[in-house]
Amino acid sequence: MQRILIVGATSAIAESTARRFAARGDALYLAGRSAERLQAIAADLKLRGAAQVDCFVIDARQFDRFAPLLQAASASLGGLDAALIAHGTLSDQAACQQSLELLREEFDVNAISVMALCGELANQFEAQGRGVIAVISSVAGDRGRQSNYVYGAAKAAVTAFTSGLRQRLYPKGVRVVTIKPGFVSTPMTAAFKKGALWATPDSVAADIVRAMDGGKAVIYTPGFWRPIMWIIRSVPETLFRRLKL
């Protein structure tokens, strides 16, 4: 049995991942903004076999509550073996171009809060000499594109941060997993036209669980995004700047 903290637990990907943890009898501590949604998810996870499920209401911008969150999770579960950081928003690129305040808010949620929380977790797991920190980044962070460069920049920051954190914690027995989903069919992407490259939250969840259980450092999910993003990163800047991406 693993004792797992899930932050952003009301997101579709996080909920699907939690269901897979519950099915094998793990103990879960859920954190998110909506108390009502957290309680509903917790009740469902208990029915699916979770050994224990408790909740903590928090907004990702409440940095001063990160330490109390980890303290509460550890006290509730009797310690932590792993954490999945899955919170975030899908930035409105056009709106961010018109509002520096909105741009800052989006970066706070999608990058700064993730890094701050990872920092708290890193210190705790380093002290105990073990643990897994899994963080949802995105393929959008591999190269900035005009359609979503605010979101992409935040995810690029998360990817770079987790890379450095992984190097720092490796000698301490702590694993850091960077998760890079592509297009995923969730309520957050409901307005988007779907196609062959789209994945379901459950298929992404399956990849996340395998990565957290195994030895992977960075995963693309679905896996076909790895060669796709290699191609996109390889396009010369003189050509790339002319593309409509």
Stretches with model-predicted labels:
Residues 46-64:
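Rossmann-fold cofactor-recognition segment
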Residues 10-12:
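Conserved glycine-rich cofactor-binding loop
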